[in-house]
């Protein structure tokens, strides 16, 4: 499923995006964010993260840098005395 989602994103990026123009207010662009989210978190979580990102895509949101969150398995697992585990 991830492979199919990534192929659809590539199709959008190379066929439709040039006609629409670069209008993304975020870095990385929404299509790159979606690809990374799918590859990092799998199909369902990647779709969820992408949907959350697309919901923020409107004129009243300032945009900016919005990286894909790290997968829990790659986040550190030690406990901090004041903040607990993260």
From Swiss-Prot:
Q: Domain of life here? A: Bacteria
The set of disulfide-linked cysteines is: none
Q: Which UniProt keywords apply?
A: Cell inner membrane, Cell membrane, Membrane
GO CC term (a single one): plasma membrane
Can you say where in the cell this protein is located?
Answer: Cell inner membrane
- Please tell me whether the keyword Membrane is annotated for this protein: yes
Q: How does it sit in the membrane?
A: Peripheral membrane protein
Q: Which InterPro entries match?
A: Membr_insert_effic_factor_YidD (IPR002696)
A Pfam short name: YidD
**Xref: PANTHER family:** MEMBRANE PROTEIN INSERTION EFFICIENCY FACTOR-RELATED (PTHR33383:SF1)
- HAMAP family the UniProt entry points to: UPF0161_YidD
- State what this protein does: Could be involved in insertion of integral membrane proteins into the membrane.
Which family, according to UniProt? Belongs to the UPF0161 family.
Name of this protein: Putative membrane protein insertion efficiency factor
Species, as recorded:
Cellvibrio japonicus (strain Ueda107) (Pseudomonas fluorescens subsp. cellulosa)
């Amino acid at each position: 499923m991830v492979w199919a989602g990534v192929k659809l994103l590539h199709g959008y990026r190379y066929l439709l995006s040039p006609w629409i123009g670069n209008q993304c207010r975020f870095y990385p662009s929404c299509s790159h964010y979606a690809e990374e989210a799918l590859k990092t978190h799998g199909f369902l979580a990647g779709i969820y993260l992408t949907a959350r990102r697309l919901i923020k895509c409107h004129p009243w949101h300032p945009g900016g840098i919005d990286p894909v969150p790290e997968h829990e398995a790659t986040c550190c697992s030690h406990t901090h005395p004041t903040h607990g585990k993260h």
